Amino acid sequence: AAGLFCAAQLAKCGGKVVILDNGKKVGRKILMSGGGFCNFTNMELSSGRYLSQNPHFVKSALKRFTQWDFIGLVAEYGIPYHEKELGQLFCDNGAEDIVNMLLAECKKYGVEIALRQSISAVAKTENGFSVVTNGETLYCTHLVVATGGLSMPGLGATPLGYQIAEQFGINVIAPRASLVPFTWRECDKFYAALSGISLDVAATNQHKTFTHQMLFTHRGLSGPVILQISNYWQPGESIHLDLLPYNDIR
């Protein structure tokens, strides 16, 4: 999503832009997001809701491009959407609407898209950068690395972006899993009998408390509250679950 959107914006400003994608089609992660309906923005955006070691960047980024800017683009393409709890906006018809919108923006401004690309080398040149892909060397004055994280390798995720960053001396924070479910230990697997049951809980660790829906699965615990608390959980820490968060039984 970031690569497609960035490419369209750069081309809109007059640049000649080429996207190199290692997949057979673009936007595959978008199609998986939001359970297939793409939670494309949130009505309650603020810098305090982001985990970042540089909060000033978050403030400046959100000031320059707000949720309303993206909502306006969605409305321009006539994409129907609805608001769920906590200000989340989802497509009515499915995530493919967002992919098609981004592709239409790229096409409108003349962005070229090359698929099934295997980048083997990136280097700094006198006038910009060189990129070796599929045995061919391409040259550019500016290079944007928008490879995303390491999640979902089956959809093409690779460590290439991290490798390029390290190659050019950019400090890389060791990646760790976040927004992820928790899996049962072997001794806890009897809870799998509860698979499919969901309820509101308060999940607390040493740093944060979130109150939202939790889902029992055959492999462990999931749902919005678990995905949120996973951002703050550290290996070895305990998480306390209050199954009656709205009741004081004292």
How should these model regions be labeled?
Residues K24-V26, L31-M32, T41-S47, N171-A174, ...:
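An anion/pyrophosphate-binding glycine-rich loop and adjacent beta-alpha core
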Residues A1-A2, K25, G149-S151:
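Residue-level detector of alpha-helix initiation sites
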Residues L20, I119-S120, T137-G154, A165-E166, ...:
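Short hydrophobic core segments
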Residues R64-H142:
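Feature captures the FAD/FMN-dependent oxidoreductase FAD-binding
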Residues K16, E112, S238:
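Residues at the starts of beta-strands that form the adenosine-phosphate
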Residues G35-E85:
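Glycine-rich active-site loop/strand segments that organize a redox cofactor
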